Every structure is written in structure tokens, then in C-alpha cells.
Amino acid sequence: MRRTRSAVATGPREQRRSGATGGLSGGESRAQRSRSRTRAGAGGGGGAVGPQPSAKPRPKPPPRAQEAAAEEPPPAVTPAASVSALDLGEQRERWETFQKRQRLSFEGAAKLLLDTFEYQGLVKHTGGCHCGAVRFEVWASADLHIFDCNCSICKKKQNRHFIVPASRFKLLKGAESITTYTFNTHKAQHTFCKRCGVQSFYTPRSNPGGFGIAPHCLDEGTVRSVVTEEFNGSDWERAMKEHKTIKNMSKE
């Protein structure tokens, strides 16, 4: 009999606990709704709250993702993309075939085309100093016109050179290996390799907008002939006045 009473007595107690728990949950729900209404009314200054948009704002990416996106370089422009930007018309297939056959990038193919037609009648010479620290290329005729100057410094260093516009000269390597000597008017820039002392090119006083290239510093195979003209640099002003073409040799 005691066991039966105990079992019967247990039932109502459990129900009371369950009811108490349910009442607490209901109280919490009402409190949450009350707080929600309070927050909704706070931003409206006590007025009626209008309908809220249903679309949710997009979540912002985490800071690490933003940093990675900022640091990521733009996609490289491929030769095909560069070609598609040009209106090649019916020549597109020929152009792409030419690039593949010559194994050239879009820039390389354009450079070859420009060099061929812009420097018609010229050849590309290459050269440099003795130790190889300084290397350059220059577009000039295969038949070189050399000036042999007898001014004080040219006489001592045997400065025989041909003159080209600056746009036809390109230093391939060795900018950090070059040192410069100037004197008098300081217009002539006598550039030498710091290591071996060879002057393979310089900026002449007669043509400060161009370069004087030493023909004996060119690589073999591109020079067809050489004509040497003596220039009386020891009497500079008179020589420059009497010579009709030297001052224009660095012009395009």
C-alpha cells in the first residue's frame, strides 16, 4: 500500500513542476516580445514603425578574406586577350598564326613589326665593355660613319665614334656599373665601366640629345663598312660652325 501511495503522490508533483516550468517559459516569451517592441519603437522616435524590407543585408567577408582580396594581383593579360582588344578584321587568323610560329608574345610581335618598318635600312648592333658588365643595343646603318675627334680628351682615349639618336639606343644591363667623367662645359658625358674602364658609348658634346657609340666595342657580324672622318675638336667652335651635318645627327 505504501508503494501505491508513493506512486500516486509522485504524479501530481511532477505535473506541478512541469506547469511551473511552462509558466516560466511563457513569462520569458512575453518579456522577449516586450523588449523587441521597445527596440523597434526606439529608432522611430515614438512614431509608427513602417514596414521593414524583407531582403537581408549581405554578410561582410571576414577581415582576412578582405585582406586577401586586396592583396590579390589583377589577372595577367594574355596574348589572346590583347589581340581580342584590337580590330584585326580578316587578318586576325594570320596574326595569331604568326605569333605561334615565331613564338612571340603580343608585345614581342608588335616590337618586331615596329622595328622592321620604323628602322627601315638599319640593323640592330649589340655591344658592350670588355668585362661584360655593360651591354647595349643600337639601331644604325650597317655602313658606319665614324668621327675621329682630336680634342684633348678624345685624343688621349682615342674616342672614335658614330652618333645615333637616343631613341635608337638601349642599355641592356650595367647601369650600376657605369661611372661618368665631365670637364669644361660638362656637356659631354664620358661614361666608363667601373670594372674594366672601357668606354663603349658616351654622350657627345656635339649631340647632347644622342649617343656616341664606339664601333670597336660592337659585336662582330653586323658592320658592313666603316668610313672615318677627322673632326678638329681642338678648335671646337670653328669646327662646329664649319661642319654642316654633325649637330643634327642625333635628330630623328
From Swiss-Prot:
Binds 2 Zn(2+) ions per subunit. GO terms for molecular function: carbon-sulfur lyase activity; metal ion binding. Its cofactor is Zn(2+). GO terms for cellular component: cytosol; kinetochore; microtubule cytoskeleton; midbody; nuclear membrane; nucleoplasm; nucleus; spindle midzone. Residues 125-237 form the CENP-V/GFA domain. Zn(2+) 1 binds at C129, C131, C193, C196. It is found in: Chromosome, Centromere, Kinetochore; Nucleus; Cytoplasm, Cytoskeleton, Spindle. Gene3D superfamilies: 2.170.150.70. Residues 54-64 have a biased composition (Pro residues). Pfam families: GFA (PF04828). The modification Omega-N-methylarginine is found at R39. Zn(2+) 2 binds at C149, C151, C154. Keywords: Cell cycle, Cell division, Centromere, Chromosome, Cytoplasm, Cytoskeleton, Kinetochore, Metal-binding, Methylation, Mitosis, Nucleus, Phosphoprotein, Zinc. It comes from the Eukaryota. The modification Phosphothreonine is found at T78. GO terms for biological process: ameboidal-type cell migration; cell division; centromere complex assembly; pericentric heterochromatin formation; positive regulation of cytokinesis; regulation of chromosome organization. The modification Phosphoserine is found at S18, S234. Residues 1-80 are annotated as: Disordered. Its main location: nucleus. Required for distribution of pericentromeric heterochromatin in interphase nuclei and for centromere formation and organization, chromosome alignment and cytokinesis. Belongs to the Gfa family. This is Centromere protein V.
